[in-house]
């Protein structure tokens, strides 16, 4: 199972994007919220992945936060809520709004999503009311390249550079220098500056 992809963001179109990892382009479906925070191609990003295996296909669904991924998993436990409807709900409501809507029995917030009518909204409220106490309310760990420098940026940048064909032994000294000179570098900036030095 694929749980995360770190690679170059390729084409973003409709409700999906392509993430290029070491020359292999993975088609990832995502909510409009996740697609909106992805950097413009051909920048590097880390995307959390939920893999769904069916008889005729393997589908990858991407998320910018752990909260959004957890809500996707919870929503798809509801009868008649498939992956497409779950993404539509997450496009219409962020995790915090979903938590408030379900606790308040707010059917209108759910019916804003494509494919969710009053009857399905009632079912979602009924089935999830007792489950949302354990759900996150909208914080979470952003897994796009806006995180400032630290262990996460360092590790993700090394993984991305390895995915682009660079050995750790050659990438690590360059990346260390980049992060030392750019303390607040984002993941995308750290990788771009490292690639610039490695290409010399």
Curated annotation (Swiss-Prot):
State the disulfide connectivity.
none
Q: Which UniProt keywords apply?
A: Cytoplasm, DNA damage, DNA recombination, DNA repair, DNA-binding
Spans annotated as Domain II: 65-143
Organism domain of life? Bacteria
Record localization = Cytoplasm
GO terms assigned for molecular function: ATP binding; four-way junction DNA binding; four-way junction helicase activity
Alphabetical list of Pfam families matching this protein: HHH_5 (PF14520), RuvA_C (PF07499), RuvA_N (PF01330)
Q: Where is this region: Flexible linker?
A: 144-148
What SMART domains does this protein's entry cite?
HhH1
Gene Ontology annotations of biological process type = DNA recombination; DNA repair
The terms describing its cellular component in GO are: cytoplasm; Holliday junction helicase complex; Holliday junction resolvase complex
Family annotation (InterPro entries): DNA_helicase_Holl-junc_RuvA_I (IPR013849), Hlx-hairpin-Hlx_DNA-bd_motif (IPR003583), NA-bd_OB-fold (IPR012340), RuvA (IPR000085), RuvA_2-like (IPR010994), RuvA_C (IPR011114), RuvA_C_sf (IPR036267)
Which parts of this chain are annotated as the region Domain I?
1-64
Enumerate the HAMAP family for this protein.
DNA_HJ_migration_RuvA
- Function as written in the Swiss-Prot or TrEMBL entry: The RuvA-RuvB-RuvC complex processes Holliday junction (HJ) DNA during genetic recombination and DNA repair, while the RuvA-RuvB complex plays an important role in the rescue of blocked DNA replication forks via replication fork reversal (RFR). RuvA specifically binds to HJ cruciform DNA, conferring on it an open structure. The RuvB hexamer acts as an ATP-dependent pump, pulling dsDNA into and through the RuvAB complex. HJ branch migration allows RuvC to scan DNA until it finds its consensus sequence, where it cleaves and resolves the cruciform DNA.
Q: Which family does it belong to?
A: Belongs to the RuvA family.
Q: What is known of its domains?
A: Has three domains with a flexible linker between the domains II and III and assumes an 'L' shape. Domain III is highly mobile and contacts RuvB.
Instruction: Quote the subunit structure annotation.
Output: Homotetramer. Forms an RuvA(8)-RuvB(12)-Holliday junction (HJ) complex. HJ DNA is sandwiched between 2 RuvA tetramers; dsDNA enters through RuvA and exits via RuvB. An RuvB hexamer assembles on each DNA strand where it exits the tetramer. Each RuvB hexamer is contacted by two RuvA subunits (via domain III) on 2 adjacent RuvB subunits; this complex drives branch migration. In the full resolvosome a probable DNA-RuvA(4)-RuvB(12)-RuvC(2) complex forms which resolves the HJ.
Under which name does UniProt file this protein?
Holliday junction branch migration complex subunit RuvA
Could you tell me which species this protein originates from? Gluconobacter oxydans (strain 621H)
């Amino acid at each position: 199972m694929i749980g995360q992809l770190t690679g170059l963001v390729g084409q973003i179109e409709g409700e999906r994007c392509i993430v290029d990892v070491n020359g292999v382009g993975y088609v990832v479906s995502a909510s409009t919220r996740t697609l909106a925070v992805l950097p413009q191609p051909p920048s590097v990003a880390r995307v959390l992945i939920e893999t769904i295996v069916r008889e005729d296909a393997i589908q990858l669904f991407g998320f910018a936060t752990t909260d959004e991924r957890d809500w996707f998993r919870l929503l798809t436990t509801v009868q008649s809520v498939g992956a497409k409807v779950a993404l539509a709900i997450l496009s219409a409501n962020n995790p915090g709004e979903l938590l408030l809507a379900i606790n308040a029995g707010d059917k209108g917030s759910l019916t804003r999503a494509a494919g969710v009518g009053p009857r399905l909204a009632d079912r979602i409220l009924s089935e999830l009311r007792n489950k949302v106490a354990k759900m996150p309310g909208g914080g979470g760990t952003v897994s796009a390249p806006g995180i400032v420098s630290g262990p996460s940026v360092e590790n993700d940048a090394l993984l991305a550079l390895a995915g682009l064909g660079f050995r750790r032994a050659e990438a690590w000294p360059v990346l260390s220098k980049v992060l030392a000179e750019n303390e607040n570098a984002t993941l995308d900036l750290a990788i771009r500056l490292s690639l610039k030095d490695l290409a010399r």
